[in-house]
């Protein structure tokens, strides 16, 4: 069955000529001239564009205001005027009309001491200028103290960026001087701030004094790339004048208006209600193991009253930056264990996407001046009992976090029927009392909110506050701002994939083990793979082409392409002594006897990490070697085939994504072994590694040098039945050396015999592998 993935890999670079023609046609563009109109600030729609939410939960907001057209105006106090001239000569001048006149000129590189003619204050004057640098441009600040006085040179700024700046503050003019990238600001003259106008001959920007560090960065390093690479349309300084109106609690204000568009300011009270969702997955076997307890996005719809009007609202709650915990009560099948459970703490964030049916959200496409004020809320965890087949139930209880507002941006919510342009409120977390614990275990005193019962049986959490935004909307209230259709198409596909993933994961309980082993040994081709899916037989050819194109970009396909380098680098990275003891999952109990040579514990942990890296590469090594033995890819492909046949939601559009995801996500916890006569070497993705005798299953020192040689020269086998399971099987039932060798080599016939004989240990192991086939 693993031939399925081999087929996909070997054919993933085949593309139909029709696809090539379509792609070439899609790349053709047409140049269109657009009149930007009055909303041309920085050449974009009237919104402060930034890259928004980053993967590290950092919100970045641009602060550069401009560019503005050359003009004469009264420069606001405590604002840097950042000037960006494009040619030499007079750059700007200013005066308080009584006793201070100042002017700035730009001189190109390599100019010897010479006199040049400038028009300053309406008069033609001769000024002595020079620039000794062959690479830097030079700004020179001249000042005179009387109407008929003489200009004198006060300061210079040498720069490669052709940027200078000054600011009025506390009756003084501040100016950048020196040589970039070490230029700094200082003041040079005292003026009357109220009556000092500035005339600028170049485009300029305004930066508040609070962003002085940012202004210094621009002076020394240049403007951001977007200011240099886009066609920016400067606007008049008059567009900066905003009418100050007293905002009511809930009102709509027309900020500006043209024949087709208007800017509306919406002020709204808001009541946010949200809930957390979780996923609790129990492992296969005897019923004592849980594989995952995790947070999931949660949609919640509700109504509330705002100024006598009933509002229908929709929220989506999601989390970012979760912390993974685990608990392992022992190695026996009847020992309570949780492979992974998620907890949100100080390093986590909660996102709440909010939409309601009011006018404010009808055209929420082009938005600026977005702000919000919200209160804090405490989320407390409840009790969750782990129902064991026998014995008292362990109970996870406690845990609490406080959500505090940390920003707001635009977002899109995905519902079952429509996409909603909404507001995303971002909350940072602080842990609160009480801590959480699991009764009847040693796990206690941990702070944060676990995913087991995050809602504490309450109907919802509630946050109150208000928001304000300015939105560009059509002047005719009956029109709606257009949105690209492609967004909705991809969004519908994501919804279908989400439903399909949930169905796939729930089908694991319906797979018969004996039939699965038979299916895993069949060399099915691509046509047979999808023969059981309704409405796809006629489209198998085009569908498989789409699958191959999707598979071409998968992690597995990329990893296979550089198999040789990844294997040699990973194997040679194990800088350990000649002999070390095996390390199992319960390392802390055996650490004192783990290293035969007496090296420190840090070395052991380092070796475990390196072994984990090697184990990930061993899958690639096995993947490229065709054998008659069963592999993890055989089982995952068989599970995939079974679920495809049973699925009621599979379609031609979703199959490529499902196939690609299955190759990467099915059976994440794998182990591989190589054989050396009567000794087996076994390593796991989790960093565990063993060396043991085949006949007795007694552990022996792990010879790293021999292991490195074996993984290069010998076949790599999937440890379908891993060392712990084999040892448990031998201790409880006893197996012959022949059976041991066949199980070590993952012989499908022997595996099927044990399953048909209802051996609980082997069945539990295979059921665990099936449970790991999740998307």
From Swiss-Prot:
Record's miscellaneous remark: In group A rotaviruses, VP4 defines the P serotype. Some rotavirus strains are neuraminidase-sensitive and require sialic acid to attach to the cell surface. Some rotavirus strains are integrin-dependent. Some rotavirus strains depend on ganglioside for their entry into the host cell. Hsp70 also seems to be involved in the entry of some strains.
Where does the record place the region Spike head? 64-223
* Region entry Spike body and stalk (antigen domain), spans: 247-478
Superkingdom field: Viruses
Ranges for region Spike foot: 509-775
Where does the secretion signal sit in this chain? none
Motif span (DGE motif)? 307-309
Site entry: Cleavage: 230-231, 240-241, 246-247
Protein name per Swiss-Prot or TrEMBL? Outer capsid protein VP4
Q: Which cysteines are joined by disulfide bonds?
A: 317-379
Q: Where does motif YGL motif map? A: 447-449
Q: Keywords in UniProt for this one?
A: Capsid protein, Coiled coil, Disulfide bond, Hemagglutinin, Host cell membrane, Host cytoplasm, Host cytoskeleton, Host endoplasmic reticulum, Host membrane, Host-virus interaction, Membrane, Outer capsid protein, Viral attachment to host cell, Viral penetration into host cytoplasm, Viral penetration via permeabilization of host membrane, Virion, Virus entry into host cell
Pull one GO CC term from this UniProt entry.
viral outer capsid
The entry's family comment says: Belongs to the rotavirus VP4 family.
The UniProt transmembrane annotation reads none
Coiled-coil-forming residues are 483-510
Gene Ontology biological process: permeabilization of host organelle membrane involved in viral entry into host cell; virion attachment to host cell
Q: Where is this region: Hydrophobic?
A: 388-408
